[in-house]
Amino acid sequence: MSNLIVHGGTPLRGRITPSANKNAVLPVLCATLLTQAPLTLHGVPDITDVRKILDIFRTLGSDVRMDHASGTLELHHKDTAFDAAAHRLPEEMRSSIMLVPPLLARFGVARLEDNVKGCTLGVREIDPHVEVFRSFGGAVERAQGSLLVRCAGPLHATHHWLDYASVTTTENFVLCAASASGVSTLNNAASEPHVQEFCRFMTMLGVRIDGIGTSRLTVHGGAALGGGEFRFDEDFHEITTFLALGAITGGDVVVRNSAPENFPLIDRTFAKFGVRIEHADGWSRAHREGPLTVQTPFTSNVLTKVEAAPWPYFPVDLLPIFIALGVRAQGNAMFWNKVYDGALGWTGELSKFGAHVFSSDPHRIVTFGGNALTPAVVESPYIIRVAIALFMVAASIDGRSEIRNATPIRRAHPRFVENLRSLGVQVEWTSEE
């Protein structure tokens, strides 16, 4: 377990170039198995989940050449081989489920651990993925603590309607559809920026996809797939994180941002706490006039609300970042996670700083800002943005705080501590058995 120790109270100042979004990188890596042509990917972050997938590729016999210094990855899956009896996909990464479609397409079989994990956000069902695999002609069964997915012949085109706009299920549909001859359509598809980035990679391979960025995708499958080069965009989660860190500490942080078109709702949510975001010339900056203050709604007798749901709603993954702003702001605000049933249990840790947070139900909390906060030792669950949110609060308080179990940060932010130090923060990793 790794912990973060921070000496807070220093306004952050400087410029940051964010890394790529792991939620785009991981599905793209899985998709590379579909082609036997050489590929070069630029901007690949040196994070734990990437290393795990590359280790899988090496085990399967793929040619993997990763330059961690430059973030350039060369892949060639020409000699890849899969044996369902010998090879199991790791359960500790939820993204490993996206290796199933390319393995099905190339080898007719995939074996997946029965308890696929990820961040501890509550129950995360595997059934929607099973429905997609079956829709394309796959057979799914349980065997010796794992899920065995088989396909007797080529995958066939299909039309499918998701009951929930799931990111990974959408990506699994596209991966299956790319290998299935004919036209497949998906309704209620996820449309997050990282899903759009993944779809752009698929089009580079030679897959025609209509409706990218909408809730209806049409995939023309069965074409021979090629190779090429692809460069990842900056992670909008990390952009938002460093803008929020600048705002909560009263500093001045400028963040590289080549896709400000994804930020109108994020910008309006910052404005609810008295923070104005400026985008210019490929960079973004947070401006704060005076203390953080929750803006009073025009409607009488209601709280300012931040409601998080699938894109184009406010992104669920960013909700903890704004909860941190809420406990530091003057005024009260309600935060509503409309997706996960176990994602707000951590907010009790904020009371250790002296914050006042009321849990309405598993999906909603209310922050009562304005309390004088003090340094503390807090424990993060295994949720990336929660560890960062606890760090944000600690960084805004004079004195030494410790964020225990901050390990999940390494899953998404390869240079988090180095970037913080460049902005003037006194912070260090510590480890314990």
Give the ranges of each region predicted by the language model.
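Short, structured segments at the rim of ligand-binding sites
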Residues: M1-E433
